[in-house]
UniProtKB/Swiss-Prot annotation:
This is Cyclotide cter-B. It comes from Clitoria ternatea (Butterfly pea). It comes from the Eukaryota. Belongs to the cyclotide family. Bracelet subfamily. Contains 3 disulfide bonds. This is a cyclic peptide. Expressed in root, seed and nodule but not in flower, stem, shoot, leaf and pod.
Amino acid sequence: MGTIARYYAHVVLFLVATSVIFTVKKTEAGVPCAESCVWIPCTVTALLGCSCKDKVCYLNHVIAFEAKTMDEHHLLCQSHEDCYKKGSGNFCAPFFNHDVKYGWCFRAEFEGYLLKDFLKMQPRDILKISKAIAK
């Protein structure tokens, strides 16, 4: 009987420890995308909006929010001209959060225009599009 009780105690301890770990990770500011970019760039998480900073992949808006100058990352910008000057694109897209003072450069005109059109859309139009896609 004692071994079964110890087994359950270990299982409960494991579940409590993992729930604490995941709770802490969700509340941290600037949580990395759980990928390293020491030798290769962010690959899998790049599709989720992550870029390399200090050899760790971070979400793009976190990099832009924590930046003190535009020189901290090659894709940070405040205007389209900044993207041209840095050679990182031709369109500077702002983030939805107005507390983020820098935008993000896009290389292709097509991506920039799509994002620009999306940002101009009203929420009801976005819902119509998502309903049409779901059908």
